[in-house]
């Protein structure tokens, strides 16, 4: 989520991506889908009714609440002159927030996949190959729903990441040595892929709201698995490396991660509004990249404050019944 806020800050404040978009944005987006799939797995088994209830409260309901509440301010910030009926149509067709809409569709598709396969790993392996083929077709625009309601194109592209996260959790039995070896192997494999993608001449395709470079499936899979291994590798005493972070930093990352849905709804609007305020005051980007970092920190603090207030005073908007600031 920090990477998404950083990307939106950079675009709003400087007018462009100074750090190449293709180098990290698609990866962190797919990492979110990977984490979603990871959280799907339960040792006691998959319950469709329970998961659909969680999906309705935790994803779909917040989508309608926040996109409805932010529709007019968002239109005003972007200078749009749409009518209320246009705004309503935008929300109902899933265009109010492309990422949350695609997450909702991808999770629903994955629910149906787990239900139909009875979560049997052999069926899931076969379905995974089919999902990869579909993702490649949609990710290269060989296949596409032209209307792209509820950003189904992006959802299909993300489906393998959910399955990868689910399988990673289900078969999470690797010891430290195996994790270190696999991490080193994936790191070596990722280096040439990232060098290729970093080239300005490397082709990419616009799929709905996301730009995907060629080899996106390979790059995304390598990146999310590297992140996963980095956060799960343990020392000899069983303490994970990530647990060696300063407590305040670990607490901040954990707190932010658990509230990512609300963070995302404000990750674009607040950077846009803050940039507009700075512009009115005569402060614009002057070529010093340190300014971007300062503005990013301000955006993160403001979004965190808003998110805290929502979880503290309006928890029902996030699917929770009790305050959880």
Regions found by a protein language model. Give the residues of each.
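Alpha-helical transmembrane segments and their immediate juxtamembrane cytosolic regions
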Residues: 1-325
């Amino acid at each position: 989520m920090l990477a998404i806020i950083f990307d939106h800050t950079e675009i709003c404040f400087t007018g462009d991506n100074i750090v190449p978009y293709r180098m990290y944005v698609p990866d962190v987006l797919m990492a979110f889908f990977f984490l979603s799939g990871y959280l799907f797995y339960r040792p006691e088994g998959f319950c469709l009714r329970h998961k659909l209830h969680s999906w309705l409260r935790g994803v779909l309901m917040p989508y309608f609440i926040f996109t409805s509440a932010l529709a007019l301010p968002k239109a005003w910030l972007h200078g749009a002159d749409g009518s209320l009926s246009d705004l309503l149509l935008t929300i109902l067709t899933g265009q109010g927030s492309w990422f949350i809409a695609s997450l909702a569709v991808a999770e629903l598709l994955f629910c149906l996949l787990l239900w139909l396969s009875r979560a049997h790993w052999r069926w899931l392996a076969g379905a995974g190959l089919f999902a990869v083929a579909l993702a490649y077709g949609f990710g290269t625009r060989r296949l596409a729903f032209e209307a792209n309601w509820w950003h189904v194109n992006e959802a299909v592209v993300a489906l393998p990441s959910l399955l990868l996260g689910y399988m990673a959790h289900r078969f999470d039995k690797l010891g430290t040595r195996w994790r270190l070896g696999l991490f080193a192997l994936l790191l070596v494999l990722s280096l040439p892929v990232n060098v290729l993608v970093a080239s300005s001449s490397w082709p990419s395709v616009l799929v709905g709201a996301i730009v995907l470079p060629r080899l996106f499936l390979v790059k995304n899979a390598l990146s999310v698995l590297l992140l996963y291994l980095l956060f799960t590798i343990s020392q000899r005493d069983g303490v994970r490396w990530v647990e060696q972070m300063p407590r305040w930093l670990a607490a901040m990352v954990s707190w932010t991660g658990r509230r990512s849905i609300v963070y995302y709804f404000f990750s674009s609007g607040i950077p846009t509004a803050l940039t507009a305020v700075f512009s009115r005051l005569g402060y614009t980007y002057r070529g010093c990249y340190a300014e971007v970092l300062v503005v990013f920190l301000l955006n993160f603090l403001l979004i965190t404050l808003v998110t805290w207030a929502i979880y503290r005073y309006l928890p029902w908007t996030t699917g929770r019944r009790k305050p959880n600031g």
